[in-house]
Amino acid sequence: MSALKDRLADTGYGLGWGLLCRLPESWVRWAFQFAGDIAWRRQGHGVQLLEANLRRVIGPQPSGQELRQLSRDAMRSYARYWLEVFRLPVITKERLLDGTLGIGESALHAILASGRGVVAALPHMGNFDAAGAWIVSTGVGKFTTVAERLKPESVYLRFVAFRESLGFEVLPASGSNSRFGVLAQRLRAGGLVCLPSDRDVTGGGIEVEFFGEKARMMGGPAALAVQTGAALMPVTLWYEGDYWAVHIHQEIPVPDGGDRREKVAAMTQQVAGVFEAGIAAHPADWHMLQRVFVADLDPERLAAAEAAAEDTAEDDGGRP
């Protein structure tokens, strides 16, 4: 059964990239919105987690109707993301440039032009892939990111090929102890690294205050900035009607005091603050169908992941 599911998943993604980009966009947009509505009505595990996360965003005691409407809007936004993923290979550079509302890109370009690297930390908002294709189109050139190893492997390889076609260099998010070193090399060479950071996927993340609760986020972007001298710049994304919106925020400086871990923790907390403001302004475009808040995490799995992360950090020179 597992092998059959893997083949079906691979076939589905293959059809997505091979067929959907050839159909009229209005048809496909309607179909994906309809699919998003169906997923929302079914109230599966992912939608339940989405609503648990959004409940923190919109207040301590949101009405059931308010939360349900927001989660429906969020699932439609998420469906739009997937529609655009399958159609991005045929979207022209001109449409990307004309269809993106960019804020703060001049500061990013200025830092890169000075020869200094930039590590951009992003939440799961809007459309990461469209934003990446846009920044490549503005003249930045190729940048480096990581991708979770999806199963089956064939689907992961399709995603890597897709993102490479947009101008990304893609490293696996797991299975390679040299990943941090490669990212550091790119930054020391004056390159751009873009990392999704609003969910801890390693068990070794940083605990932050987020919407009034404890949450765990990736400390890698801040650690890379501290180690390499690169600029740490949070980025928030959302949809503005038919447009993509990309806000590249001001650099978060490395604190003067404290040891390395304290600096990384303080900078990650500042990133979380930027994410919080961006998500609060555009909650329907935060596509977080996973556990983020510590209260929602399984204690035993969290403890095991933390132990594994500590072992990895020791093997990797103490890097988070």
Segments from the language model and where they lie:
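Membrane-anchoring hydrophobic helices of lipid-metabolizing enzymes
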Residues: M1-L122, Y156, S165-G167, D315-D316
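Non-catalytic C-terminal accessory region of glycerolipid acyltransferases
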Residues: S2-L4, L8, A39-R42, P60, ...
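Short amphipathic alpha-helical segments and helix-helix/interface helices
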Residues: E105-H109, G132, V136, F159-V160, ...
